[in-house]
Amino acid sequence: MMPNLSCFSVAISEPTCHDPDSGGHFGGPDGYGGRYVPEALMAVIEEVTAAYEKERVNQDFLDLLDKLQANYAGRPSPLYEATRLSEYAGSVRIFLKREDLNHTGSHKINNVLGQTLLAQRMGKTRVIAETGAGQHGVATATACALFGLDCVIYMGALDTARQALNVARMRLLGAEVVSVETGSRTLKDAINDAFRDWVTNADNTYYCFGTASGPHPFPTMVRDLQRVIGLETRRQIQYQAGRLPDAVTACIGGGSNAIGIFHAFLDDPGVRLVGFEAAGDGVETGRHAATLTGGLPGAFQGTFSYLLQDEDGQTIESHSIAAGLDYPGVGPEHAWLRETGRAEYQPITDSEAIEAFRLLCRTEGILPALESAHAVAGALKLASEIGKGAVIVVNLSGRGDKDIEAAAKWFGLLGTR
């Protein structure tokens, strides 16, 4: 019988050799990360940093988080061997880390439970968050309902239209959903408005950042809260396959689910770490969200990392069929891993992702999020590259209920026959 694999408090409390410096830079003072925010936010961010450093080693805080993750969120999540998908890929073993089975349907709950509990410990009564696909918004609204906190979710107007089901879920959970009409009306614009709210209402408000980006300490804090994915996976794959995998894959927008599963394998050079970005209509078309493939270093929304920008340094609008990947930036630790060569980042187009979405439905009876489908598509490419006998882990970061309408339209399934 498999042993209890709970390792959530370990993920948060134990520092690693891959942590940033005191200023939040990965790769030294001139590296990626840091704090690029207005002076009005510096004191607030310092308050969050101090609170997190205190609570991450507070046993009462850790014990409560462990209980919530086990009894409320449903951890550990299973590692499932997808035998029919593996047969399709050709004599490989593909394992799915089932973050889609967590409460609220994605990996987002791992981060949100920790941050909302931190907000409560800090005496905040109001929590704000940004969301793209709606999964982080749903998770935040859920946790705020659990802790009795007011909740406001900022979401681009384009995303509220294509993720209407999650908008309804957030409102049912008691959250106010603010539709952002400025800019490209997607995730980056939702983040901008959330920052404006935070500056104005810092006394009673906590900003629950959803991805491993933004100003320090958010990239590190979100990573720590998501590290449980990789720590569980490492134990599970050795138990089920008898060895470490040849490759670990994940989709990547801002990068929280990817850094969460990658981190436990950083010191294993025999394990390839591959993040699959949203190539949209193709990187060559300019309509994509493949930041590490087609972007350049620069400061964006509080951090120094890669972003999609023109020759004048202005941010370029991103595009992806997956709202959660439709973002022109990426977390600074991923930029550092790319620079060092420890992780690889490859583009997957909309059409490749949605074909993988359908394939997983029909081979395994699993409906993945369109974001996660990018990782499935990428794993199939890796399978042919690595060859027979390969063991590949895919982080299935979320479920696809929210994407049924988009997929049905793509495949022409909504008409009568």
UniProtKB/Swiss-Prot annotation:
Entry-annotated residues carrying N6-(pyridoxal phosphate)lysine: 108
Gene3D superfamilies assigned to the protein according to its UniProt record, in alphabetical order: 3.40.50.1100
Pathway: Amino-acid biosynthesis; L-tryptophan biosynthesis; L-tryptophan from chorismate: step 5/5
Protein EC: 4.2.1.20
Cofactor(s) recorded in Swiss-Prot or TrEMBL: pyridoxal 5'-phosphate
PROSITE patterns referenced in this protein's UniProt entry, alphabetically: TRP_SYNTHASE_BETA (PS00168)
Top-level class of the enzyme under EC nomenclature: lyase
UniProt KW Amino-acid biosynthesis keyword: yes
GO terms, molecular function: tryptophan synthase activity
NCBIfam families cross-referenced by the UniProt entry: trpB (TIGR00263)
General function of this protein: The beta subunit is responsible for the synthesis of L-tryptophan from indole and L-serine.
Name of this chain's protein: Tryptophan synthase beta chain
Organism (species): Mycobacterium leprae (strain TN)
